[in-house]
Amino acid sequence: MLTFGGLSRGMMESTLSNALNTLTGHIQIQTLEYRDDPVIENRIENPDLLKTMLNKTLPPGTKWAFRIQISGVASNARNSEGITIVGIDPDREADLSFYGDNVSQGRLLTSGDDHGIFVGQALMDNFETKLGRKLVLITQGADLKTASRAFKIRGTFRAEMEGTEKQYVFITLAAAQKLLGVDTAVTSACIKLPEGKNLNITDLTAMEQTSRELSRELPDGLTALSWGQLLPLLKGYLSMFDSFMLLWYLVVFMAMAFGLVNTMLMAVLERTREFGLLKALGMKPLWIIRNVLTECLILLILGLFAGNLFGFATIRSLAGGIDMSFVAQGSEFFGMGHIVVPFLTVKDVLAINAVILILGLLVCLYPAIKAGRITPVEAMAHI
């Protein structure tokens, strides 16, 4: 149960980390309309004012950057596909997302490289092109007319999911602003808060409280959204995770309970004469029940001790991670990375041990009560 719990927790953490690393961040600042309609018309017109406020408000160690993120089409002589155009500050973006994590070919974008583009390896393969070749981006500009521009491929990246490689293309923020004709405007500010004892990204309540406090400081027309608000499906999955795990522990324990009851019943039946003799000597049924439950408790504690040692040893042996690439399509469906590192929290260990200990004693009540009801006459008749 510890091993399964650790693996499940690792899968959940992998899914969450991958989602936040795919351009979501911990908190995003957008206009009120952008989330429902992510087009360039719903942009932040005066980012300088927002920049000043963020530099004063955010805690030390926070990473943040402006972005332009819109839908568009990538095209060359061989192919064309719908993609998401992401205008970034190359110097800041590497600290916020998967950008720069795994460069497959070429190099990253640099500040001032307004004619370069950084694409996924899968996208470049689909377009049958190579480094140095041009890729045309087509989208709708701020004037509602079609805007297009050619960029040279500077490099390619590998991502945890092939779909990510096909979806996102990166250009500099200045290049995106020029393409769309929006001067200094941006569509969002992505924020990555420093994690520590006062902040845990899996603590949805604390994260949403932080975003609400930030929203109160923002200029009119802007809002701060936590990753839970940006990814409601993932938020729902995580909120059900602990309940799902507890239910799974109960199911596994039900299978274990049959073996435990069988063991205790055999022990009671084999000691029928002993219990009958104790009854004849005046021992009360409640004392016999207490003795049987005490024996059961000792067995459970010994079993938990051995099981915990084995579970911790197994998780420790998998500390380097489990390569899930053999089920790559399945892991991509759930948004997991290719490497899952099992781990347990103190809460997980306590929950598993509590379920086994409490339910184990409840299961042992039947053999204990049966032992308490044995009479001296029944014991004498027992061979």
Segments from the language model and where they lie:
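A hydrophobic alpha-helix feature that marks transmembrane segments and, especially
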Residues: M1-R9, L238, D242-A280, I288-L293, ...
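Hydrophobic, regular-secondary-structure patches
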Residues: G5-T84, R107-D113, E213-R216
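Alpha-helical membrane-interface segments at transmembrane helix boundaries
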Residues: M12, L16, L231-W248, V268-L269, ...
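C-terminal membrane-exit region of the final transmembrane helix in multipass inner-membrane proteins
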Residues: L344-I383
